[in-house]
């Protein structure tokens, strides 16, 4: 079974919940899993303006932080980020910007990649956020495995590019969110296993 790393940024916890669900799905399928958040780079005064952001920072501060070793180790890379004006957060982008040495050595190529995101509003930049991630993955020489509409659950979340969660008033994942994440994980692992067998 493949080795999968789930690398994400979450300010208030929604993308964190998505990452944890993806991690659980991968473990159930027998994959080796690393779950890693990226370093927080926002100024403390910005974080302190939202109680949920402060609380989430406390929840994850002792958990492992993503490293280049995690990327090199993995056969499958899932990345997650909230939308920020139709793109990934600066925190995740800062991590991506450190990958040059691995990229230059060809160590990011030929891995399976996919993404997930969340926004407060419907169509709040989810597709463009995923596509911006995928542009990076193409530069890596990665194999992007989007879910498309390969399972009926994709008609519930409506996002063929990855998994997108609309938070609205709540950041809790619902049955459709969980099913979409489970399907994405099963799909990337299935493709990776075919490529490595």
Q: Where is each model-derived feature located?
A:
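N-terminal beta1-alpha1-beta2 submodule of the flavodoxin-like/Rossmannoid cofactor-binding fold
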Residues: 1-105, 166-197
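Aromatic side chains
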Residues: 8-9, 85, 95, 113-116, ...
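Short connector loops at secondary-structure junctions
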Residues: 34-45, 148-161
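Short amphipathic alpha-helical patches
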Residues: 49-50, 94, 101, 119-122, ...
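Short clusters of hydrophobic/aromatic residues that line enzyme substrate/ligand-binding pockets
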Residues: 108, 161-164
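Short, glycine-/small-residue-rich phosphate/pyrophosphate-handling segment
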Residues: 109-156
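Phosphate-binding/catalytic loops
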Residues: 118-122, 163-172
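A charged, well-structured terminal subsegment
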Residues: 138-159, 167-180, 188
């Amino acid at each position: 079974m493949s080795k999968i790393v789930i690398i994400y940024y979450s300010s208030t916890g929604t993308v964190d919940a998505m990452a944890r669900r993806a991690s659980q799905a991968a473990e159930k399928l027998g994959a080796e899993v690393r779950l890693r958040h990226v370093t927080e780079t926002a100024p403390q005064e910005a974080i302190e303006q939202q109680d949920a952001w402060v609380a989430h920072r406390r929840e994850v501060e002792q958990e492992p932080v993503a490293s280049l070793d995690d990327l090199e180790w993995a056969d499958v890379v899932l990345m997650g980020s909230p939308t920020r004006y139709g793109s990934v957060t600066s925190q995740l982008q800062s991590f991506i910007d450190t990958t040059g040495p691995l990229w230059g050595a060809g160590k990011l190529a030929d891995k399976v990649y996919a993404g997930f995101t969340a926004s407060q509003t419907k169509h709040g930049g989810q597709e463009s956020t995923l596509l911006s991630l995928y542009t990076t993955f193409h530069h890596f020489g990665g194999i992007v495995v989007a879910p498309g509409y390969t399972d009926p659950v994709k008609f519930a979340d409506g996002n063929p590019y990855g998994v997108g969660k609309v938070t609205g008033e709540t950041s809790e994942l619902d049955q459709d969110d969980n099913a979409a994440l489970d399907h994405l994980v099963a799909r990337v692992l299935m493709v990776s296993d075919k490529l490595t067998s």
